Amino acid sequence: MIMKSQQNRIEVSDQTLVVLRAPQRIWSKLYQYQRVCVQWLWELDQQRVGGILGDEMGLGKTVQVIAFLASLSFSGRQLAQGSRGSKLGPTLIVCPTTVMHQWVREFHHWWPILRVSILHDSGSYSGTSASSLIRSTCANNGVLITRSDH
C-alpha cells in the first residue's frame, strides 16, 4: 500500500518501511502518468507479482521501465548493508529484434550506470559465448536484452 508519494520518493508501508528512491534527473522528466506507472511497477515488485505494461505506441513504456529499473538500482546503492528493501538484480528484457538497439540507446541516455548487453547475433556479445555473457550479466546485476521473435 502506498503511503506517501513525494516528488522522487515512494514510501511503501507493510511490516517494515521500504523506500524506492527515483533519481531526480529521471523523475523530473517523467510525465505524471509515467510516474504513476513507476509506482505501479513498484507495487507489483513489492507483492512479488508480474504485470503487463501496454498502451499506445509512443507513450513511453520503455522510459517507464528504465525509470523503474534505475530507481531500483539507485535505491539499492543507498541501502545500508543488512537493511531490507528492493534492489536491482539481473534483468532480462525480451523484445522484438527491431527495437533491441533502441532499448540500449534509451538505457545509455536515461541511466548509463547500468551494464546493458544484447544477446543476439547482431548484439554486443560477439567473440564471447552466450553463456559467458549471461553469467557476467547476472554477476553484475546487469540488463540483458534478447529477442522475442524467431
Indicate where each model-derived feature is located.
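ASCE P-loop NTPase motor core, strongest for the SF2 helicase catalytic module
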Residues: 2-150
